[in-house]
């Protein structure tokens, strides 16, 4: 519990690795209290990121793309992540995960 107050993180994804049924939620650490103090835009970016994940998991691809592209510009440290997610969105637009998709990325390779 002490870590929660010293480090700030965001959820990146929910992934099921090849051969596994259950998903694991993946997070990244953004920084500590000092980092937050010097990065005043982190809270806004975190809120926008949370909205991105909601639209992504609801298959609202156009809106998710808009959020990802905006966040890439506003949060350059996270640009590689958003590029990966934008690639996934493009793939999902071509091959829908289906109406019953639970928002979990299912890896096809190890």
Region locations from a protein language model:
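Extended, hydrophobic beta-loop-alpha segments that form or line the acyl/peptidyl-thioester binding
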Residues: 67
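Cytosolic regulatory/linker segments at or just downstream of nucleotide-handling modules
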Residues: 1-54, 58-61, 70-94, 98
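Intrinsically disordered, low-complexity, charge-biased linker/tail regions
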Residues: 98-110
């Amino acid at each position: 519990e002490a870590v929660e107050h010293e480090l700030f993180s965001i959820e990146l994804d929910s992934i099921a690795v090849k051969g596994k049924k259950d998903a694991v939620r993946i997070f990244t650490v953004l920084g500590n209290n000092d980092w937050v103090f010097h990065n005043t835009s982190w809270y806004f970016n975190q809120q926008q990121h949370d909205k991105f994940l909601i639209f992504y998991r609801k298959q609202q691809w156009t809106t998710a793309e808009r959020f990802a592209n905006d966040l890439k510009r506003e949060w350059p440290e996270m640009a590689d992540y958003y590029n990966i997610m934008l690639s996934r969105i493009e793939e999902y637009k071509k091959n829908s995960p289906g109406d019953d998709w639970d928002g979990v990325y299912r890896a096809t390779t190890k």
